[in-house]
């Protein structure tokens, strides 16, 4: 779809009418369009489309529930270049978030660095360190019906952070 077609008043009014009937709209993404323009109108990611279809055709036993999930590794900085971490990919936490969303829950995913694709309609909060994860979990914890702690949080952090790259000692 062309960005100008999508932004047209008639198109927007028709989308609003559909939404007023609780019809789920998978919005187009922002990107390069076939006409050469940049803007909203690019076909949504196929995974998002499939997730929306699966959600629309699934039962929702967790509807109205809030689920907090942690995922991925944490990184503890030693200096501006190096950090301590582990090999966690975050796959399990992201998969749990996707399933909880498909079951109708409002899902908040607090994730360390991960290359996993954010699940459709899941609120993702990116963090780096164990302290960052701790603070985010505490800020959301009291509002959750379920909490799943699947992150691979680091066991250690340095006593001191060096503002400059630590030199090798021969």
Language-model region placement:
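Flexible nucleotide-interacting loop at or near the entrance of a catalytic core
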Residues: 50-63
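A short acidic, helix-capping loop that chelates divalent metal ions and anchors anionic groups
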Residues: 4-6, 33-37, 78-79, 118
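A glycine- and small/hydrophobic-rich beta-loop-beta segment
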Residues: 113, 121-170
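Glycine/threonine-rich flexible loop motifs
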Residues: 4-8, 78-85, 156-170
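Glycine-rich phosphate/diphosphate-binding loop of Rossmann-like nucleotide-binding domains
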Residues: 12, 16, 61-129
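Short glycine-rich anion-binding loops that position phosphate/pyrophosphate groups of nucleotides
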Residues: 31, 72-76, 151-158
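Short, glycine-/small-residue-rich phosphate/pyrophosphate-handling segment
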Residues: 1-30, 40-53
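General beta-strand structural signal in soluble alpha/beta enzymes
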Residues: 25-28, 109-111, 149-150
């Amino acid at each position: 779809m062309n960005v100008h077609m999508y932004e047209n008043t008639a198109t927007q009014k028709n989308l609003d009418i559909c939404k007023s009937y609780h019809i789920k709209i998978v919005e187009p993404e922002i990107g390069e369009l076939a006409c050469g323009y940049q803007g909203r109108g690019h076909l949504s990611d196929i995974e998002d489309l499939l997730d929306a279809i699966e959600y629309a055709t699934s039962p929702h036993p967790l509807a109205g529930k809030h689920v907090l999930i942690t995922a991925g590794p944490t990184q503890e900085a030693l200096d501006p270049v190096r950090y301590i971490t582990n090999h966690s990919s975050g796959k399990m936490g992201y998969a749990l978030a996707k399933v909880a969303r498909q079951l109708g829950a409002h899902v908040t995913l607090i994730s360390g660095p991960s290359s996993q694709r954010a699940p459709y309609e899941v609120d993702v909060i990116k963090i780096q360190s164990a302290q960052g994860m701790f603070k985010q979990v505490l800020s959301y914890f009291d509002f959750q019906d379920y909490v799943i702690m699947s992150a691979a949080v680091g066991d250690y952090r340095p006593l001191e952070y060096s503002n400059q790259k630590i030199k090798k000692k021969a």
